[in-house]
């Protein structure tokens, strides 16, 4: 759960995934982890909001492999790899892949979804953004990220149709409609 009513801490250097793994103070060598039939509800309280927005991810099946901070093992496995399939808000198939090579401070990630009724996102968008989704059909989301210590290159395809929104004022009344 995240509360955005607190001041943001000052920006500080944050290591890459490889840096985080390598900073673990004990020798670590995890061959694989399997996660089966799990669920997560992520909630966030927006700035000056009294109600949290949340999103449910269910039917999570994931594998994590090759997590190690031991140089000889890093050389042997080459990279840490995470693959996940899940169900987003009970409708959309969510597929995520994260690859962390051990020979450079970089990573690649992809996130893909299938079709869903966008109204299902209202428990997130109403409390956090003051947006009421009246109607809309998502065909797919394709997100690709290549990141390094200093930069990231991203591609996002958000394929939808017939999106109809209402903006909600801070007092809860409907302000205007956007199509």
Mark where each language-model region is.
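A short local loop/turn or secondary-structure capping micro-motif enriched for an aromatic residue
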Residues: 51, 103-104, 116-119, 162-165
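Outer-membrane beta-barrel translocator domains and adjoining extracellular loop/strand segments
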Residues: 3, 48, 169-171
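Extended terminal
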Residues: 99-101, 112, 129-179
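Elongated, acidic membrane-bridging lipid-handling scaffolds
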Residues: 10-108
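Short, surface-exposed beta-strand/loop "edge" segments at domain boundaries and coil↔beta transitions
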Residues: 88-96, 117-119, 164-167
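Short beta-strands and strand-coil junctions in structured, solvent-facing domains, enriched
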Residues: 41-43, 71, 118, 130, ...
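Extended amphipathic, helix-rich lipid-handling scaffolds
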Residues: 1-40, 111-146
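Transmembrane beta-strands of outer-membrane beta-barrel pores
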Residues: 39, 59, 115, 160-162
